[in-house]
């Protein structure tokens, strides 16, 4: 079985398809082959194995021995899916999922074990029925002259003109609430475009590196990530707060 160019790990029938930019390996289309393929993919390409070993003692080699015992030639697709999903959940990573035509596995402990800190019904009350919407953002002005913008996803792009329009409409307000709780994630550039409206100077926001080989420590040299202000666009100059929770991807 070949590794294919997908970000997520997908189980289709008994064939596991997964990402690769390092090598092209062949695995038997069998429970054993699929198990080996998935374990090797994580071992070579997952970024946080050493970090998670330090944080809570994750030993990926021990995980191999533990879950290898649960693999048998006669198991069906549902049984195989369950074992592979359980193995991935050992990573405790809400971004690592396993999917098939009939099932979808996700590490839900990441958010289910903590307060939701978000209520759709309450949000509908303070958004009301007359809220405005632009580029996927819902926005409203509260009675105390505080503006509110909800961004439920960064999957679709946010137009620069749309941001100008929204911020111009809200310019009369004394403050702004940016709500990204339960944001399903999406494009980093979309989030950066929004954040650029809240700074007047270049800001260092972090560092980024990527995997360069199969070793757990094979990473490129960290590269600084800078947030550039949108100097030729409308920028927010008053107080602002951000609401987030553990379901903000």
Where would I find each of the regions flagged by the language model?
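Bacterial Sec-dependent N-terminal signal peptides
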Residues: 1-28
């Amino acid at each position: 079985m070949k590794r294919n160019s997908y970000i997520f790990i997908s189980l289709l029938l008994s064939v596991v398809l997964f990402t690769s930019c390092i090598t092209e390996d062949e695995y038997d289309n069998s429970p054993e082959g699929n198990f080996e393929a998935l374990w090797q993919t994580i071992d070579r390409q997952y970024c946080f194995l050493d970090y998670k070993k330090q944080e809570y003692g994750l030993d990926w080699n021990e995980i191999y021995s533990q879950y290898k015992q649960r693999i048998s030639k006669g198991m069906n697709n549902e049984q195989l899916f369950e074992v592979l999903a359980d193995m991935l959940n050992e990573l405790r990573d809400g971004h690592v999922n396993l999917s098939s035509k009939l099932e979808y596995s996700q590490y839900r402990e990441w958010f289910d074990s903590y307060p939701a800190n978000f209520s759709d019904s309450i949000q509908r009350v303070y958004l009301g029925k007359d809220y405005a919407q632009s580029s996927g953002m819902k926005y409203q002005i509260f009675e105390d002259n505080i503006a509110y913008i909800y961004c439920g996803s960064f999957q679709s792009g946010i137009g620069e003109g749309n941001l100008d329009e929204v911020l111009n409409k809200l310019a009369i307000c004394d403050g702004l609430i940016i709500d990204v709780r339960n944001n399903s994630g999406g494009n980093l550039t979309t989030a950066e475009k929004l954040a650029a409206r809240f700074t007047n100077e270049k800001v260092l926001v972090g560092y980024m590196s990527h995997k360069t080989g199969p070793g757990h420590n094979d990473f490129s040299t960290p590269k600084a990530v800078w947030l550039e202000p949108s100097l030729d666009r409308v920028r927010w100059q008053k107080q602002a707060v951000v609401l987030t929770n553990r379901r903000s991807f």
